[in-house]
Design a protein with these regions (language model features):
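Exported/periplasmic ABC-transporter solute-binding proteins
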Residues: 1-97
Length: 97
């Protein structure tokens, strides 16, 4: 999508933050006349940026013990969140893990 938008001066695209490297981010508002907010780690995690979402992983505690639980715990660890940041997403603050 980014390549298609780059070819058209009038195009607008929407995608995940990890896919937005090298593109111009624009401020958006929840309503007409409302404050336009630029996407950033701070505005996304605070909920101020109006078109962001969390990604969830659902597991069954009774069925997904062991390796799955270890993986989820690693994802929520500082090491796992470092990988999240390395691939272009915003890591969760410790109080949200």
């Amino acid at each position: 999508m980014i390549q298609a938008v780059a070819k058209d001066a009038n195009a607008i695209g929407y995608g995940g933050i990890a896919y937005g490297e090298g593109v111009k981010h624009i401020k958006v508002s929840k309503s007409d006349g409302g404050e336009a907010i630029e996407p950033s780690e701070e505005t996304v995690l605070s909920g101020k940026y109006p078109i962001s979402r969390f990604l969830y992983c659902y597991v069954s505690p009774s069925k997904d013990a062991g390796a799955v639980a270890d993986y989820i715990n690693w994802c929520l660890s500082d090491a796992g969140q470092s990988v999240v940041k390395d691939v272009g997403y915003f890591p969760l603050p410790k109080n949200m893990r």
